[in-house]
Amino acid sequence: MATPREIKKRINSVKNTRKITRTMEMVSTAKSKKISDRVNASHPFSNKIKELVSSLASLSGVVHSPYLRRPEKIKTVALLVITANRGLCGGYNSNVNRLAKAKVAEWKKAGVNVRLFIVGKKGISFFKFAGEKAEKTYTHLDDKSGYKEAEEFANLFLELFANEEVDAVEIASTVYYSSASQKPEVTRILPFEPAKEGNGNDLVVYEPSPERVLESLLPLVVKTAFLKAILEANCSEQIARRIAMKSATDAASEMIKLLTRGYNRVRQAKITQEISEIVAGADSLN
């Protein structure tokens, strides 16, 4: 049986761990709130501009753009996987990695060549262990990442698509729906999906021409799509870490209770034993 001193040392160790997990929980809560505000603030703009570009793209026979090409058969697809650089966030990384791996297997089974691009150390190590070679890897994204990083990705994949090096661009990431709901999904970015035929407003006169307007706006839509994916992934990571750290803090508190009870029992037993020895010694003297 452990001595009172050993149990006390264990209690202090768990208390120190609880301080760390509680601090990490508070930091993740603050970060997730800040990023979710950015996500919600970007939605009206991204939704409206996507609606406008979708309407422009539906003007069949009027608008032509390399970004609107729709290959009869997809031969090569670019897949961007967004994970975190750090762990301690529950199943956040493993859920995205498993989904992306299943998607890669699905494409390969269909005879499609997959060009893999991975964000985050956790995704890089996962696919390296799985034997999947990544064309490019990125580890510079964090909770402060935003439009600059989104523009970097958008320019790369727009160029690949326009040059017909890939026939489709997809993102595997965690999609943020609310603070209580996040889900790993694969989102198609290119080719761009226009509105249903007939939804384009033919009564609108575009100045300059629809092609010029679309040429400027469509890359912006793609950039906002990447920005949305980055922000939502970061927000989901912080929420997952907050939940994981709260669970760890609660578990530490419960362990401290159990250890304290054990400490009190051992201490009480030791005191009782000492009293018994004193009484026995006094009796022997009499």
Curated annotation (Swiss-Prot):
It comes from the Bacteria. InterPro entries: ATP_synth_F1_ATPase_gsu, ATP_synth_F1_gsu, ATP_synth_F1_gsu_CS. GO terms for molecular function: ATP binding; proton-transporting ATP synthase activity, rotational mechanism. It is found in: Cell inner membrane. Gene3D superfamilies: 3.40.1380.10, ATP synthase, gamma subunit, helix hairpin domain. The keyword Methyltransferase does not apply. The keyword Repeat does not apply. Its main location: membrane. Belongs to the ATPase gamma chain family. HAMAP family: ATP_synth_gamma_bact. PANTHER family: ATP SYNTHASE GAMMA CHAIN (PTHR11693), ATP SYNTHASE SUBUNIT GAMMA, MITOCHONDRIAL (PTHR11693:SF22). This is ATP synthase gamma chain. The gene is atpG.
